[in-house]
Amino acid sequence: MIRVAIAGATGYTGAELVKLITGHKEAKLAAVTSQSYSGRAIQEIFPAMRGVVDLVCEPLDINAISQRVDCVFLALPHKVSMGYAPQFIENKVKVVDLSADFRFQNASAYEAAYQEHSAKSLLNEAVYGLCELYRDKIAGSNLVGNPGCYPTSVLLPLVPLVRKGLVETCGIISDSKSGVSGAGRAPSLGSHFCEVNESFKPYKIGNHRHVPEMEEVISLEANEPVSITFVPHLLPLTRGMLSTIYARVTTGTTQSMIRTALMDQYDSDTFVRVLPQGEFPDIRHVRGTNFCDIGFHLDPGSGQLILVSAIDNLLKGAAGQAVQNMNILFGLEEQTGLELFPGAL
């Protein structure tokens, strides 16, 4: 049984982790921490967990928690996790970090988007935790940087095609939409009900911090610098994410070749579903699950490829993928604890 701690258990992602680990047959939730709610019971903070989770939130004492767990999820803000991960690693605790602190190989790219990195020596040790693409590297790691939600939705459909040389690496555009839970649980004017209900708007055009994360991965896969035009939008939904990605195919690329590349990559994967030709993802069909659905259309005349993906931003885009990473780290079947299915409505 894997003993698990969740640091930052009272945010939306942390709460999803609490739910998933509580229902995981090979893991036991041993500790939950919260700076804001220290000393309060999880079931008091989230009444839906009443009678299910009886843990009390505690301060994040690394040495005390390390004695009780095998794995820790750091569901902490960006710039905070890097202060805790090194000591957990030193204490032989495997770390899955859900912030951006260990998603980058290039410290300069991280620092340009966030701040100075205080644990640069760990960046080469950390593995980017996009499970279906990097599971072999994840399996041998002690530190996983769980990908961002937008990068997950963009990279899963795009990387297999870049690897096969089927798309041009210049002029890639992603038009992405996210539910409001992506903004986190802390109250803010931008996520206030009256500000988002019955509305739809773009935000952070030209300066979203997920762009350098996506560009680093694509550049490494393409073995050349790649820039992505990324336009995020805020949907008046609680959860869910849909990305529409535009790219030009290389000379000679056909629809059949696109499908073959996607199926070769994902046909044996539980959580990535390549839809039949002519069908496209719907947020409703992945909400509450760890699935990523992918559809595509190629205009043979213009060579314009349109990829569409849908995920639940809190699950495949965060907590679900984090648990999938834990499963890989400990040699479990990837779907363990993630047997989640959408409702009919």
Curated annotation (Swiss-Prot):
Name of the featured protein: N-acetyl-gamma-glutamyl-phosphate reductase
Catalytic residues identified in the record: 149
CDD domains linked to this entry: AGPR_1_C, AGPR_1_N
Family: Belongs to the NAGSA dehydrogenase family. Type 1 subfamily.
EC numbers on record: 1.2.1.38
Organism domain of life: Bacteria
Pathway(s) of this molecule: Amino-acid biosynthesis; L-arginine biosynthesis; N(2)-acetyl-L-ornithine from L-glutamate: step 3/4
Any Pfam family the entry gives: Semialdhyde_dhC_1
Role, per record: Catalyzes the NADPH-dependent reduction of N-acetyl-5-glutamyl phosphate to yield N-acetyl-L-glutamate 5-semialdehyde.
Record flagged with keyword Oxidoreductase: yes
Gene3D superfamilies (UniProt xref): Dihydrodipicolinate Reductase, domain 2, NAD(P)-binding Rossmann-like Domain
One annotated Gene Ontology cellular component of this protein: cytoplasm
Keyword Iron among UniProt keywords: no
SMART domains (alphabetical): Semialdhyde_dh
Catalytic activity: N-acetyl-L-glutamate 5-semialdehyde + phosphate + NADP(+) = N-acetyl-L-glutamyl 5-phosphate + NADPH + H(+)
Subcellular location: Cytoplasm
Keywords: Amino-acid biosynthesis, Arginine biosynthesis, Cytoplasm, NADP, Oxidoreductase
InterPro entries for this protein: AGPR_AS (IPR023013), AGPR_type-1 (IPR000706), NAD(P)-bd_dom_sf (IPR036291), NAGSA_dehydrogenase (IPR050085), Semialdehyde_DH_NAD-bd (IPR000534)
Alphabetized SUPFAM superfamilies for the sequence: Glyceraldehyde-3-phosphate dehydrogenase-like, C-terminal domain, NAD(P)-binding Rossmann-fold domains
GO MF terms, alphabetically ordered: N-acetyl-gamma-glutamyl-phosphate reductase activity; NAD binding; NADP+ binding
Source organism of the structure: Desulforapulum autotrophicum (strain ATCC 43914 / DSM 3382 / VKM B-1955 / HRM2)
Chief place where the protein resides: cytoplasm
Gene Ontology biological process: L-arginine biosynthetic process
